[in-house]
Amino acid sequence: MKYASNNIRNILIAGHAGSGKTTLTEALVYFSGAAERMGRVEDGTTISDFDPEEAKRKASLSASVVPVEYEGIKYNLIDAPGLFDFEAGEYEGIRAVESVLVCVSGRSGVTVGAEKAFQLARKNGKATMVFVSKCDLENANYFKILEDMKIRFGSTICPCVVPAKLDDGTPVYINLFSQKAFKYEGGKQIQVDLPDIGHRFRGLIEAMSEAIAETDDELMEKFFGGEPFTTEEIVEGMRKGVKDGLITPVFCGSAVNMQALDMLLFNMHKLLPSPEHEASTLAEDANGEPVELHCTEDEPTAAYVFKTVADPFVGKLSYLRVISGKVTAGEPLTNARTGEVEKITKPLTVLGKKQIENDGIGAGDIGAVAKLVSAKTGDTLCDADRVVKLPAPVFPKPSLFMAVTVAKKGDEGKISSALARLMEEDPTLCYINNAETHQQVIGGLGEQHLDVVKAKLKNKFGVEIGLEAPRIAYRESIRKACQKQGRHKKQTGGHGQFGDVIINFEPCDSEQVVFEEKVFGGSVPKNFFPAVEKGVRLAAEKGVLAGYPVVGLKATLLDGSYHPVDSSEMAFIMAAKLAYKAAMPEAGPVILEPIHTLKAHVPNDNTGDIMGDVTKRRGRVLGMEPDEDGLQTIIAEVPLAELANFTTFIRQTTQGRGWFTTEFARYETLPEMLVPAVVEQAKKLGNLDEAADD
């Protein structure tokens, strides 16, 4: 393969929306010479945001893999979206890299997106580095941001390059490793005299030296002895500290004006771990036993599918991170999940819209393969002689659900296949064909997410849809017992129809309809019992209030009569239905609504607001407990009908830090004051008409 694993750096570029991630990626591509011109987010011309929706919205919507080759090193940069609705990109990318570069805006400072990116990196054991962008802007405040990072990210923060200005206001950048300063003209580095930044300079050098000293006992002795470190000791100590999670180096510059990018690239090479530095990757063999994979081409192939692109015109493209071995054209690889064999087409290096064929993808490298049949995101492709499975990815679960309406008649059938294609490339999108409410429902991470799905369905698949709140699947039940007769008699010439039953209807704890018989003396022959039961069950599919299915109902056949000639199965089905319809209005009918268990994970400062809102939504707070990410988990029970806009509320209230899950708990009686609205809606939907027809 072209690049040995020790000359590869796999890096996720993450942070808040607008912090400069895509511009930095674009600048690094241009700086390396891989692009003739530098694109702009504002113009929709960047390499990583090549999707039409990204260009239109001027924001990244999915993770984009951008390979950069510079001075013999290959940097596989993964530009992740900063918008919370599209954070699946971060979760995809984190599985393919050893390092995370957190981008922080020199103007906006440390925002929630940067915090979440840093936490995701730490949770997944990745090396971290910070780049403070836009440092040449007038209102940038690097040192305030530095102090804020120490508070939010912890004591590992270690500045390595700091900004300053010459007397004429020209931005310069001080390299604390070499203790030299540089200005930039057209992206080219020019050394200048070290500007005076007061007492800060010695303090920064002292702090960096102490951080390096803590990585090695010999360096600690040298530090306390007052001896300066050599350049080699600084780099090696810093590299070790980064790998062990003891140091988070902070660099800065301006991507737009090509300032200090050379120092960033150089230190991404020197300080961030290569795939070779990973001791091993843990997987499971075919028997579920643990097995270690090593980053070498001498081992059998194991490659992880971390991203999928499904385009109706270009076809399916699977992005692979090769853990061991190598991926080459014509090689058969086994999908560990399905057992199917995939034949590998020519491996590709993808740069924006450009696809370049190559000889293969070596251990530790990232590339793409087209036209895989069974593979999806999270799958492991491996040598048939050593079938291994890497841990399945964990993605945020959909929290906002909307029903789909079709603008053009006849497009209903196209929706499911089009959504299936979109779900291949978006693990946080889900599709439910709800047979009970007769609606097609899609779920995502927020309003923007579903709006993009709507746009892609139209632009990629020619299906125009609308979105509306999904209907609630209510139930009906009764509160008291009622005994009624159902008598079906019909004479039409020849054989007639006759069935006569007396049934007692009462509430019960079962979620289903329970049927029993207590007939004495053969008033209803046993061979008609199943028909009576069938009639009750058919009738109970529609309640008398709003036409919703009835639950918690026990029907006991007590008595009746029959005709030796005219009685039939159908006659007793009809008799049971008549008894049901006569009894239900007098049995205290009620409408039941679904109650969900809500688990809201929010910062401690927001717990009061969230609990107050839950109460306003007719919810009951059951308790609160800390979670593993330092948030508080509020546990509550809330009617599903009240959770429609909770996704937006929790995100706005917590500034994007909070998230939640819900799970069906049970059905409860709908408050009397809300019944008329539900009944009125049922009339509009035709529920009651259908019930009457039965």
Label each residue range with its predicted role.
Residues 1-694:
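Structural and coupling elements of P-loop NTPases
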